[in-house]
């Protein structure tokens, strides 16, 4: 086997494959290392992609030339728009995915890629020379060398599975794990955190009594994550809804001491926005029921994922409380739920490029950085892969701003604020969310994907044509006036000549009366109806960009900044922001601290105008 590559990617989950494909598209020779080739981009938790904010991230990945959206479209068995009745800033797609097909399609494309070498092995050591990445040593004893490395180990690093008092050294779904990488990272100077997440039981569909649950009825639609996919679902696979009840809660409360979480066995910090059923019963004691969704894991629907019932209870207690839930009285369990603890990096050790501050040419992406979710992981993998490729060419990294993308918000939060619990992207985290919509992801980011060579000239041209068409249509509508004798005027009792554009702003007007079957109706209506609000957010973003222009030198001595609060000094020394805008976003830094910092930089003339 060739032992010399341009890049090494450790881990072939959602982050790892994005990094590998991005590096390979830049014509680099990539070694992609994973424990088990049959588990590439497996979905150890929910069999879905997207959701609030997360669906927009997947759209952004696609606009940049990443793969998650494209393969999600090919493997989806259900797709819907969430928050459709709410404002456009919070709308997002969510799709149920055939998890086996998704993994298979990506594995096959990796195997076909001449720039990617798949290596089935563990990594036992990461080596650096004078704080610069050098090589990795495999479980086989072989040493692999490269100029750059992207670490994407997910929840596999020093991980253990917990059910009740049972603790098993294992990765997700009984996969291999390793403590060797954790040991190696500590020796290199990295600080590690201990995090926890969990997953519910899977059951056989044949054991469910569907007469006692609610069926989700969905219409066919033409939704897609990817501009490169034309797949349309002719038939949606249904999910089902049922509820826990007081008997369920009674069994859980009577056995709390047997839960790994509540017995004190789990030391890691769990996700705030994806609590276990034990947490929900304890924290929301006033509620006598909680939702449970039955989600098929594949197109054949043999196995059902019980969304809402993540647990670390022992197997016998799981069986007891599950049987109290309507529809599950005679259930057969394929796999019991569990909690998993794992090591993660301190994300404050990362740059915005996702290169680590500790070791040069060494990048990290995905759950190892303290995030949760396939979408957050894939986004980081793509950015790390892009920037590793740019590093190989001695070019500046791609750093997306908070006003550019949810991906920019995600990475900025990790790098500037850090996280003490598994980080999940929410629309509320984005201050410019009206700019970061589902419908304009391609408009916002395709220019970067094209410039980087990750999307083709034809794809980019099609996106440009789309928005040119929308602008031309708006211009046409502003100049075309409705005759008072027309059928539309009579229908809405319009007495004076009015431009079609102004008519579209009236709530009583049905847009189809004017736009007919115009292809980009949704995008056009959002643009004209929210023009004022969008303009204001752009102005806010522009003001913040001015602060981004004020650079903070690497060699700044914060002890010499007059009247800077002690807390501000401590945090600035640890986080080492590169601009005033980044310093402004650090928790505990006050406006007065920022003023003193700007005054100091102006006084000593060490900032870039």
UniProtKB/Swiss-Prot annotation:
Q: Which branch of life, at top level?
A: Bacteria
Which residues are involved in binding NAD(+)?
A: 270-284
Keyword set, alphabetical order:
Cytoplasm, FAD, Flavoprotein, NAD, tRNA processing
Biological role: NAD-binding protein involved in the addition of a carboxymethylaminomethyl (cmnm) group at the wobble position (U34) of certain tRNAs, forming tRNA-cmnm(5)s(2)U34.
Task: Name the Pfam families for this protein.
Answer: GIDA, GIDA_C_1st, SAM_GIDA_C
One Gene Ontology term of the molecular function aspect: flavin adenine dinucleotide binding
Q: Where does FAD bind?
A: 11-16, 123, 178, 367
GO CC terms: cytosol
Task: Name the cofactor(s).
Answer: FAD
Xref: InterPro entries: FAD/NAD-bd_sf, GIDA_C_N, MnmG, MnmG-rel, MnmG-rel_CS, MnmG_C, MnmG_C_subdom, MnmG_C_subdom_sf
Family matches, as HAMAP family: MnmG_GidA
The family note in this entry says: Belongs to the MnmG family.
Name of this protein: tRNA uridine 5-carboxymethylaminomethyl modification enzyme MnmG
Listed SMART domains: GIDA_assoc_3 (SM01228)
- In its UniProt entry, the species of origin is given as Mycoplasmopsis synoviae (strain 53) (Mycoplasma synoviae)
């Amino acid at each position: 086997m060739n032992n010399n590559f341009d890049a090494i990617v450790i881990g072939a989950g959602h982050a790892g494959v994005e990094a590998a494909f991005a590096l390979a598209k830049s014509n680099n020779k990539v070694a992609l290392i994973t424990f088990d080739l049959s588990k590439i981009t497996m979905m150890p938790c929910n069999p879905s992609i997207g959701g609030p904010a997360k669906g927009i991230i997947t759209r952004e990945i696609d606009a940049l030339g990443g793969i998650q959206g494209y393969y999600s479209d090919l493997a989806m068995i259900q797709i819907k728009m969430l928050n459709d009745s709410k404002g456009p800033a919070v709308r997002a797609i969510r799709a149920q995915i055939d998890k086996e097909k998704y993994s298979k399609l990506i594995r096959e494309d990796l195997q076909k890629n001449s720039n990617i070498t798949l290596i089935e092995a563990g990594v036992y050591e990461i080596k650096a020379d004078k704080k610069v990445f050098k090589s990795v040593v495999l479980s086989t004893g072989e040493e692999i060398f490269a100029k750059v490395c992207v670490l994407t180990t997910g929840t596999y690093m020093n991980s253990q599975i917990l059910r009740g008092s049972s603790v098993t050294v294992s990765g997700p779904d009984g996969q291999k794990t390793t403590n060797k990488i954790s040991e190696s990272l500590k020796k290199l100077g990295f600080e590690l955190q201990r995090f926890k997440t969990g997953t519910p039981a899977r059951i056989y569909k044949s054991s469910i009594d569907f007469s006692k649950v609610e069926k989700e009825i969905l219409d066919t639609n033409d939704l897609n994550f990817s501009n490169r996919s034309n797949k349309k679902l002719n038939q949606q696979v249904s999910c089902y809804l049922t509820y826990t009840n007081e008997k369920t809660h009674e069994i859980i409360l009577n056995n709390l001491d047997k839960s790994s979480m509540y017995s004190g066995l789990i030391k890691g910090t769990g996700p705030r926005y994806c609590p276990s059923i034990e947490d929900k019963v304890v924290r929301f004691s006033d509620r006598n029921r909680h939702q449970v969704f039955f989600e098929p894991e594949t197109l054949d629907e043999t196995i059902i994922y019980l969304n809402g019932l993540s647990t670390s209870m022992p197997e016998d207690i799981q069986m007891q409380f599950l049987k109290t839930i309507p529809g599950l009285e005679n259930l057969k369990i394929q796999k019991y739920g569990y909690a998993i603890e794992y090591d993660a990096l301190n994300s404050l050790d990362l740059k915005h490029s996702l290169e680590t501050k500790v070791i040069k040419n060494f990048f990290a992406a995905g759950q190892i950085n303290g995030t949760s979710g396939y979408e957050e992981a894939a986004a980081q993998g793509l950015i790390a892969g892009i920037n590793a490729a740019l590093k190989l060419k001695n070019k500046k990294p791609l750093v997306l701003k908070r006003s550019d993308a949810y991906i920019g918000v995600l990475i900025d939060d990790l790098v500037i604020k850090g996280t003490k619990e598994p980080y999940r992207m929410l629309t509320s985290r984005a201050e410019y969310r009206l700019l970061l919509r589902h419908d304009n992801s391609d408009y916002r980011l395709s220019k970067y994907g094209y410039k980087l060579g990750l999307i083709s000239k034809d794809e980019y041209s099609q996106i440009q044509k789309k928005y040119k068409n929308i602008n031309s249509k708006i211009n046409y509508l502003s100049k075309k006036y409705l005759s008072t004798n027309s059928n539309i005027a009579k229908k809405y009792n319009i007495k004076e000549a009015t431009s079609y554009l102004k008519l579209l702003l009236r709530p009583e007007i049905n847009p189809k009366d004017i736009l007919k079957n115009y292809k980009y109706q949704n995008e056009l209506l959002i643009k004209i109806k929210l023009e004022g609000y969008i303009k204001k957010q752009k102005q806010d973003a522009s003001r913040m960009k001015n602060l981004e222009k004020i650079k903070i030198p690497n060699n700044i001595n914060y002890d010499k900044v007059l009247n800077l609060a002690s807390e501000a000094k401590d945090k600035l020394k640890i986080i080492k922001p590169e601009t005033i805008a980044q310093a402004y976003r650090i928790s505990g830094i006050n406006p007065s601290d920022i003023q003193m910092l700007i005054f100091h930089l102006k006084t000593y003339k060490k900032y870039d105008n």
